[in-house]
């Protein structure tokens, strides 16, 4: 799984939530406090939650499964496309077509139409048509390309989706939940975390924060895919050179096994005073305090 540090989170502005008047009370457990009318997200929680999400993505991809990257807001479009392409996964970054998951059979027809038009544009068939017909087909192709380019080669439903801003991608999240597809999402202080399977509390508006999370999830995918390749290679080599294999298992594997827990321990024990790191001036918001008091009162009844 990919590692992320407190320094990276702070530099990317991941801790900045929305204005205190724009919040979802269900996010209270992920809020550290507020400063100047802005909620401050608890980055210690973000570190832990991201670690869980990253491990899940790596494990999924190590089994040969597929992740769909989703981010249609302007700030997320480039990062979603670039990182999904980098890790060899699929993406939607322009507009989520209603029924993309729940009506996949129909969407596949549009995907096949896009593939057909792409072939026509490159194999010379356009030369046999009139200029007016070519213009019409190109208009159709560009429209389909804008919405479906990222899933043009996706042959089946994804095994999970990674979402930037679960509020903005509410339809995608709803469709995924309806089909039992796990949702990994960057969730800001104005979002409902209960509709997400793997919550990553953080700023879902800042470019640097979006790119940080998206690139780290892509790294998790790459790590998982690499595991698939390693397993296939090991299977092919089994019985070919048992002596070399025995040495590798006896010497190299333990080193890797020691390194992994060390890295995980470092990530878990990165204890930073957020108030000191952010320059102070942070206080528990009355809204958060009241919400917590109400929750405790309800539990005691």
Swiss-Prot record:
GO terms for biological process: translation. GO terms for cellular component: cytosolic small ribosomal subunit. It comes from the Bacteria. One of its GO terms (molecular function) is structural constituent of ribosome. Keywords: Ribonucleoprotein, Ribosomal protein. CDD domains: RPS2. InterPro entries: Ribosomal_uS2 (IPR001865), Ribosomal_uS2_bac/mit/plastid (IPR005706), Ribosomal_uS2_CS (IPR018130), Ribosomal_uS2_flav_dom_sf (IPR023591). The keyword Ribonucleoprotein applies. Belongs to the universal ribosomal protein uS2 family. PANTHER family: 30S RIBOSOMAL PROTEIN S2 PROKARYOTIC AND ORGANELLAR, SMALL RIBOSOMAL SUBUNIT PROTEIN US2M. NCBIfam families: rpsB_bact. This is Small ribosomal subunit protein uS2. The gene is rpsB.
